[in-house]
Amino acid sequence: MSGFRLEHADEYNHAAGTESNFNESVYVNGFELERRCGGWMRLGNRANEGHAETQVCMYLPDGRIACQFRRPEISNNEAFAAGGLSYEVIEPFRKVAMHYEGDIMVLDDPELLRDPVRLFKTAPTTPAKIDFELEAVSPMHGGEPLSPTQETMYGRDFSLGHFNQHMRSRAAVDIGGECWRFDAWGWRDHSWGPRYWTNIYFYRLLIANFGPDRAMMLLKITDRGGRTRRQGVLQYDGDYEEITDMDLYTDWTASKDPRHLRLGVRTARRAVLMEGEILRLAPLRNRRKVGDEMLQSRIAEGLTLWRWDDREGMGITEYIEILEDEEPVGYPL
C-alpha cells in the first residue's frame, strides 16, 4: 500500500501525542460460520484523559449476546492491559493474542443495549474468560502516512496511523461455566492518533472472511461536507486487491437498523456482487458533550452472514453515524 510507512515497531505502543484525545487501540475478532457465532474485543488507551476504553462483545451460539464496556483508569500508554483485557504481540505482522477475564453481561434481548443506564443496572452478569489467538492469512494493510497530504482511512481526526489484517482466529470462551471453542477466521486492526467517535459523520464498514484465501474489508465514509470516499480491499487467492469502486444498498428494520445488504465491488482484476444478512445486532452508542451541546453517535455492530459466488462467509458490519434530532444522518443510505 503506497504512501504509508509500517514497521515492526508499530505493532507496539507508540508515544502518546500531545492531543488531549490521543487514542491508541487494538481490536480483534473471529467468527465461526457453522454455528453462526463469534465476537470481538477492543482496548483503546486514552492516556491523556486518564482512562482506557474496554469493549467485549460475543455473539453466543444460542443466540444471546455477552458483552462488557468499561473505562478503567490508566496513567500512561506503555501497555495494552486494562480492566481485565490484555493484548500481546507474539510475532510482528504474523501472530497476536487478546485475553479477557472478568464479569460479563449476558443478554437474552440485545434491545437493552439501547438504554445503557438500564443496562448496567439490570443486566445479569457472570464471570467470563475469553482467549483469542490470531495468525495472519493476509498481507498487512495500512500504516502511518508519509506526507501531510496523504489521505488516511478514517480521516486524521479519527486516527493518524492505522493498519489491519485478516487472520485465522482461534478462541476459547467460558461464559459462566458454559464453554465453547472455535477455530475459524477473523480480522484485527491497530490505530493511533487523535480520536473522538463523534468526529465520524457517517460510515459503513464491512469486514468478512470466506475461508483462508478470500476476504473483504470495505469502507464507505461521508464527511459533514457531503464528500463520500469508498476504499478497502478484497482478498482473492490470498492477495489483497485495492478496490476502485463500491456500491452498497441497505434494507432497514422499523428501528432504522441495517438488516440486509447488497454490495457491488470492483478492483482492477474483477467485479463481484455479494449479499449480506445481519443475523444479530448490538445497538451501541457514544456520547460527548461540547459546550452546551451533547453529541451522540449510534454504533451498530452486526454479526453478518455473507454470500460471494459459491462461498458463504461471516464477519462484522459496523454502521457509525451522528444522530441529529434523534435521527441517524446516514439513513437510508
Model region roles, listed by residue range:
Residues 1-333:
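Structured soluble/peripheral alpha/beta segments that form catalytic or ligand/cofactor-binding pockets
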